[in-house]
């Protein structure tokens, strides 16, 4: 339609409510998105206190916390550099962003991220399963794969053949034309929101 999109920020209260359990903990350090100096300061603070940073988590295009805000190449590059230097893992949560933001699955395939090193782990789901089937995918770097304990990981959400068929069908539909369409529709949507 020609009508502008209506949207609500009703999820923000619930988002912050559930994060409240992490406030005040000294073993969780948060950094504002794309604040490279803040990220460097967080790693320096951890080192100063003798804390080992197990992992850094990033969402390439935010969903619930600040919908649509994207991680910059400079911030990602700093995170990759710092995690590697401090022996921490870099985990990218592409559950919502994969395919839907830039027409590609991985953050390292986003425009401006070409040539940057891959994260240690990256998760995908909703774009692969049409948001309908219980399917999540975990991509691992060689380093992370070597740390991952081998064994049987079974639960309700694993090894769903139909969900795998859905993911294969989705990936078979991803053509250069579809990727361009995703990017063009995204730009169009942003222009309409800005009016």
Model regions and ranges:
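PLP-dependent aspartate aminotransferase-fold enzymes
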Residues: 1-54, 74, 187
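Conserved PLP phosphate-binding loop immediately N-terminal to the Schiff-base lysine helix
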Residues: 59-73, 88-113
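Helix C-cap/helix->beta junction micro-motif
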Residues: 82-86
